[in-house]
Swiss-Prot record:
GO terms for cellular component: cytoplasm. InterPro entries: DnaJ, DnaJ_C, DnaJ_domain, DnaJ_domain_CS, HSP40/DnaJ_pept-bd, HSP_DnaJ_Cys-rich_dom, HSP_DnaJ_Cys-rich_dom_sf, J_dom_sf. GO terms for molecular function: ATP binding; heat shock protein binding; unfolded protein binding; zinc ion binding. Participates actively in the response to hyperosmotic and heat shock by preventing the aggregation of stress-denatured proteins and by disaggregating proteins, also in an autonomous, DnaK-independent fashion. Unfolded proteins bind initially to DnaJ; upon interaction with the DnaJ-bound protein, DnaK hydrolyzes its bound ATP, resulting in the formation of a stable complex. GrpE releases ADP from DnaK; ATP binding to DnaK triggers the release of the substrate protein, thus completing the reaction cycle. It holds the Pfam family DnaJ. Belongs to the DnaJ family. This is Chaperone protein DnaJ. The lineage of its organism: Archaea, Methanobacteriati, Methanobacteriota, Stenosarchaea group, Methanomicrobia. It comes from Methanosarcina thermophila. Zn(2+) 2 binds at C160, C163, C186, C189. Residues 6-70 form the J domain. Zn(2+) 1 binds at C143, C146, C200, C203.
Amino acid sequence: MATTRDYYEILGLSRDATPEDIKKSYRKLALKYHPDRNKEPGAEEKFKEISEAYAVLSDPEKRAQYDRFGHAGINGQYTAEDIFRGADFSGFGDIFEMFFGGSRRGPRGPRRGSDLQYDLYITFEEAAFGVRKDIDVPRTERCSNCSGTGARPGTSPKRCPTCGGTGQIRTTRTGLGMQFVSTTTCSTCRGKGQVIESPCPVCSGTGRVRNTRKITVNVPAGADSGMSLRLSGEGDAGDPGAPPGDLYVVLHVMEHKIFKRVDYDVISEVPISFAQAALGTDIMVDTLYGKVKMNIPAGTPTHSVFKIKEKGIQHLHGNRRGDQLVRVVIKTPTNLSHEQKRNFFASLKALSSGKNPGGEKGRYDKFTEKSKKSKGFFEKVKDAFES
């Protein structure tokens, strides 16, 4: 439509206005700017603007679309005629005629099919590397027996005898010295302008049947939970002559027993013994791409975080990969014998003096200092580990 002004602003309302508030404000403004009463320049355009705002905000479905998507949600979903159809303009003349000209209109055009949503659950690995999935989608499809017309084969729909094929019923009233014309959707043909005398036995005259279709979905590498994949034309069938709706596949990535995800980085945790942390060692770490050797320096404190470069998840747009961040957790010895305790405390005493049990000096202090410098790096993934 022509106006791009906020509909609530046009009617002087807040966004939490009730249906009664909307109707009351519209009638007040419509009486003020109706062209039959107000001959000032711009009055007719103003009347059209407030009528458009009322037509949208008085319809719960259109209002919800507007509240969520603004004018884009209305212009992309409804034709100009659809915006006004069904609104209660009684007492203010033929709004359709004022906007679109002429004293008669044709029936409403065929409507596209409804969009559908399918929730697809995939594994952590499938999201990381991409996958092809076959899904079964229940939807309405065009009836093959009547080719979507709704009429028994060999027959065809007839012009509606009630509205003469216009899809609308016009009612004229006289009051206040003026003639008012209101228009409503024909209840016989429901605005289509045609009636089916001999319905198709397969679809009962609807032109559509319920069916389940197998569809292949290509999930790209790097996909994440909440991502929506649009499959054009795979929604419900539309009216005859209108396109089908679209299918939106919403992805849900299942939790992994080892890995977590932060953006494109993979987070994991591995346990090490006190001896491994104190003396240093090489350990094998699980990644999405197999096991990788990782060095644990001598004197590594618990909760230290190490980075394994490019072992994370591939970016959706490009060939870059994230990293894997590995937090090591030192397992505390339990149920030690008396001799084991004595040896353990001897090791602690050696480490506290800047030595490790192997006799090399200074490595404990060096790695303690390195760990302190790495705290900012650890904070980046702290929430992921603690969640």
